[in-house]
Amino acid sequence: VLESLGVCSIQTDSEIWKRVWSEEERLNYASTPMFLVRAEKSAEQSFQLGDVTVRRGEKYQGDISFANGDIVLPGTIICGKLPGKTMLITGGVHSGEYVGIQACVELGAELQPEKTVGTIVILKVLNRPAFENRAGSLGLSDGKNLNRVFPGNPNGTEMERLAWAITKEVYPKVDYYIDLHSGDDFEALTPYVY
């Protein structure tokens, strides 16, 4: 049972009662069995997302395939030297919001596994087809707003399938999620941080 929970080592101490009970307690409760069990959960030695596996202490930058290869997104996975929580950072839900996309690119370049605890997953441009075709922030083939179709549909339109892949293949693997947005390509806003 413990192995199914990821426990890698178990230690028992049946002599603990001699160290924690007073002489009076030993006389009164000596027949009560007392022991300490210590179990340690093994730290994951790698992180797998889509078709990419990254070992602890390593960094991957490149394409990550989802939905049996039907969806390919540019990403970075930083698997820190020390185990911990997993953070997802996404940009480009609206492909014309360049500030979030650029922030993802820069974070992916700067963050290093030696200075990271846990795992950081950066998906730089979720709406990749519209971004690559400079076609605004809606789905290229279906005209849908990715931000409005979650959790998606595996048999739906382009954006619905993308939302479904993110919902089913990415969300279950992360503890925290930051989705970066900014002014869209049609808005006259100066990029800023506040």
What are these regions (language model features)?
Residues 3-21:
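Conserved S-adenosyl-L-methionine
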Residues 1, 24, 154-155:
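A generic structural signal for short
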Residues 20-42:
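Core SAM-dependent methyltransferase catalytic element
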Residues 37-194:
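Structured catalytic-domain cores with a bias toward divalent-metal coordination
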Residues 12, 34, 72:
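Short coil/loop residues immediately preceding or within conserved phosphate-binding loops
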